[in-house]
Amino acid sequence: METATLVAISISCLLVSFTGYALYTAFGQPSEQLRDPFEEHED
């Protein structure tokens, strides 16, 4: 394969894996540890 193709595939895989990790952190099991500043603030 050409170098440009390998670089494009590598960047695409990196972007997809980062997006998957971000979604897992936001909505998966670690999201229970995140704090919500709107719930902490009382009016």
UniProtKB/Swiss-Prot annotation:
Membrane topology: Single-pass membrane protein
Subcellular localization: Plastid, Chloroplast thylakoid membrane
Family: Belongs to the PsbN family.
GO terms under biological process: photosynthesis
Function according to Swiss-Prot or TrEMBL: May play a role in photosystem I and II biogenesis.
Keyword RNA-binding: no
GO terms under cellular component: chloroplast thylakoid membrane
Top-level taxon of origin: Eukaryota
Parts of the chain that traverse the membrane: 5-27
Protein name: Protein PsbN
InterPro entries, A to Z: PSII_PsbN
Lyase recorded as keyword: no
Keyword terms, alphabetized: Chloroplast, Membrane, Plastid, Thylakoid, Transmembrane, Transmembrane helix
Pfam annotation, one family: PsbN
